């Protein structure tokens, strides 16, 4: 920032911060994270976003023998996200809902299906299997749409994360012409997640943001 006297160069080297403020980098501290050699992921499907959130809260409490979190990452994908990428499980669910094949789900109401892309990592294959077993045991208390299946094969779980990476442009591509994409970060206490996510969906629908996710 102080290297330039020309106002144009000063502005060109600023970055846009929170709420549109301008900022510059005066100091950077880089901290690396341990790259666990063994990883596994699973796409967990639940019939409601509230049930998915309850499962996330429960998995957040899992720790291994060293006190580290068992679940290293959890990304929630609602029905709109799944629909935008033509997720095969979502399409299957939608078909079963349409044919009234799912008890407790109103025909045509496929908006409840929610996926949680879950990742666990470990230093050894044995630790990885212990983590998977702990997560599977935790999930027995919840109702999943399809059986839980973790994979430790990179060629398989990389596809899950590729889907996650493609969600934003895919959802954006479903917007009506002339509309604007708004992005907002919202934080909740983890214990409030089940109620908060369900109420947030209701709030978005009530105000006519039909393409939101």
Indicate where each model-derived feature is located.
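Noncatalytic alpha-helical scaffold of FAD-dependent oxidoreductases
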Residues: 1-213
